[in-house]
Curated annotation (Swiss-Prot):
Spans through the membrane: 21-36, 101-115, 140-156, 203-218, 237-252, 457-472
Protein name: Photosystem II CP47 reaction center protein
Lineage: Eukaryota, Viridiplantae, Streptophyta, Embryophyta, Tracheophyta
Cross-referenced SUPFAM superfamilies: Photosystem II antenna protein-like
Cellular localisation: Plastid, Chloroplast thylakoid membrane
Summary of the function given for this chain in its UniProt record: One of the components of the core complex of photosystem II (PSII). It binds chlorophyll and helps catalyze the primary light-induced photochemical processes of PSII. PSII is a light-driven water:plastoquinone oxidoreductase, using light energy to abstract electrons from H(2)O, generating O(2) and a proton gradient subsequently used for ATP formation.
GO terms (BP aspect): photosynthetic electron transport in photosystem II
MF (Gene Ontology): chlorophyll binding; electron transporter, transferring electrons within the cyclic electron transport pathway of photosynthesis activity
Keywords from the named record: Chlorophyll, Chloroplast, Chromophore, Membrane, Photosynthesis, Photosystem II, Plastid, Thylakoid, Transmembrane, Transmembrane helix
GO cellular component terms listed in the entry, alphabetical order: chloroplast thylakoid membrane; photosystem II
Organism: Fagopyrum esculentum subsp. ancestrale (Wild buckwheat)
Co-factor: note: Binds multiple chlorophylls. PSII binds additional chlorophylls, carotenoids and specific lipids.
Family, similarity comment: Belongs to the PsbB/PsbC family. PsbB subfamily.
Length: 508
């Protein structure tokens, strides 16, 4: 049977045993990739600085997902929070990776077994002796089992009743840790940033899935609905399964890109909207103002800003700054962050405090403009010095640092002032090591960006797949000349006109 490459899956169309086999093999590949990728990431991951070199700066992709579900320790003796551990237990990062690889191997063997022993009695219709699947019943079984898993995850794993809980943090990504979560049954449970909604929604969805599964196991579909939706055709299952997958992919692309309780910034990095809205900058200024209100000096107030919070307020951590096709981690772009230099405050010769206008997300270059508290331009770095009126030299701009490594240091020479004004466009100023990884200075995206791009792209592709296979199954008789009510097996290539027994080919 000579099939073109895009039609090879027809070999399992009327073969339930081998249909199971190829799905088990697919599971083996997925689990094997996950375990192998986890081991690779653990081999290259540096856990020494969770503040300035967290997992998302290093381009880790599967470690954040393990951490989000409650894994924090390694058999190497380190913890994701920066401490050391003596007894990580079996469910460490390596334990999870190993279990996926073992599971992959078992699935591989099961797939081979089902490929060899494909003609099982369980697949045969007692009345006809031909292979057939009771698809509505199988749907009910799968719905019931997935409902049990969903309910169990929400009621036991997330709540900590039997499990570790999940990663929970504050709105600014400073105090994250794994903890148990109580279900949120009120209106607050619909807030995407409330962790309690994860528990309550899994419990509710799981309960619904269990009830719906029992319904589909006990109630047969009406004949007209069965025929109208082609419920006896395996391609109907394919079409509706693809619909479920692309819908889920669109949802998680949104929760990842826009942020939610399921995608903490400590594990996946900040979102672009936090830069656009000055989210961390506002919190930093609020803390400094609160310190000044308590009679702290400007230097003391800025020195109490957590380095972690200052690091979030840096454009290099914005996932929208990296191009989609710039390979590598953020550390390979602008370098490994070594330390916060402090907050620069610029002043003109009249003593006015000046603020550098920050670079918007989608600019690669941006004019250096310094404005006062009223938004009036007071200084800039001109493109044409001959026509300048507000140059740093003319206005007499100076800069002084508060907090960080340069706390109390001031500069008045124009070249240095302009250097720090340019860097202040990018948010808080950090010392970056570009030598270690031979970083090229071009911003990269974080795993948040990669995940969103991948899932949005595949969701679109799978949407078209759903339309394609849904159309094929609904209009099979039109497209292929096969009667939709035809129950007999069709041997592809046996007839000149597919499904028409009067056009049987002659054996050569």
């Amino acid at each position: 049977m000579g099939l073109p490459w895009y039609r090879v899956h027809t070999v399992v169309l009327n073969d339930p045993g081998r249909l199971i086999s190829v799905h088990i093999m697919h599971t083996a590949l997925v689990a094997g990739w996950a375990g192998s990728m986890a081991l690779y990431e653990l081999a290259v991951f540096d856990p020494s600085d969770p503040v300035l070199d967290p997992m998302w700066r290093q381009g880790m992709f599967v470690i954040p997902f393990m951490t989000r579900l409650g894994i924090t320790n390694s058999w190497g003796g380190w913890s994701i929070t920066g401490g050391t551990v003596t007894d990580p237990g079996i469910w460490s990062y390596e334990g999870v990776a190993g279990s996926h690889i073992v599971f992959s191997g078992l699935c591989f063997l099961a797939a081979i077994w089902h490929w060899v022993y494909w003609d099982l009695e369980i697949f045969c219709d007692e009345r006809t002796g031909k292979p057939s699947l009771d698809l509505p019943k199988i749907f009910g079984i799968h719905l019931f089992l997935s409902g049990v898993a969903c309910f169990g995850f929400g009621a036991f794993h997330v709540t900590g009743l039997y499990g570790p809980g999940i990663w929970v943090s504050d709105p600014y990504g400073l105090t994250g840790k794994v903890q148990s979560v109580n279900p949120a049954w009120g209106v607050e449970g619909f807030d995407p940033f409330v962790p309690g909604g994860i528990a309550s929604h899994h419990i509710a969805a799981g309960t619904l899935g269990i009830l719906a599964g029992l319904f589909h196991l006990s109630v047969r579909p009406p004949q007209r609905l069965y025929k109208g939706l082609r419920m006896g055709n395996i391609e109907t299952v394919l079409s509706s399964s693809i619909a479920a997958v692309f819908f889920a992919a669109f949802v998680v692309a949104g929760t990842m890109w826009y942020g939610s309780a399921t995608t903490p910034i400590e594990l996946f990095g900040p979102t672009r909207y936090q830069w656009d809205q000055g989210y961390f900058q506002q919190e930093i200024y609020r803390r400094v103002s609160a310190g000044l209100a308590e009679n702290q000096s400007l230097s003391e107030a800025w020195s109490k800003i957590p380095e972690k919070l200052a690091f979030y307020d840096y454009i290099g951590n914005n996932p929208a700054k990296g191009g989609l096709f710039r390979a590598g981690s953020m550390d390979n772009g602008d370098g490994i962050a070594v330390g916060w230099l402090g907050h620069p405050i610029f002043r003109d010769k009249e003593g006015r405090e000046l603020f550098v206008r920050r670079m918007p997300t989608f600019f690669e270059t941006f004019p250096v403009v310094l404005i006062d508290g009223d938004g009036i331009v007071r200084a800039d770095v001109p493109f044409r010095r001959a026509e300048s009126k507000y140059s740093v030299e003319q206005v007499g701009v100076t800069v002084e640092f508060y907090g960080g490594e340069l706390n109390g240091v001031s500069y008045s020479d124009p070249a240095t002032v302009k250097k720090y004004a340019r860097r202040a466009q990018l948010g808080e100023i950090f010392e970056l090591d570009r030598a270690t990884l031979k970083s090229d200075g071009v911003f990269r995206s974080s795993p948040r960006g990669w995940f969103t791009f991948g899932h949005a792209s595949f969701a679109l592709l799978f949407f078209f797949g759903h339309i394609w296979h849904g159309s094929r199954t609904l209009f099979r008789d039109v497209f292929a000349g096969i009667d939709p009510d035809l129950d007999s097996q069709v041997e592809f290539g046996a007839f000149q006109k597919l499904g028409d027994p009067t056009t049987r080919r002659q054996a050569v």
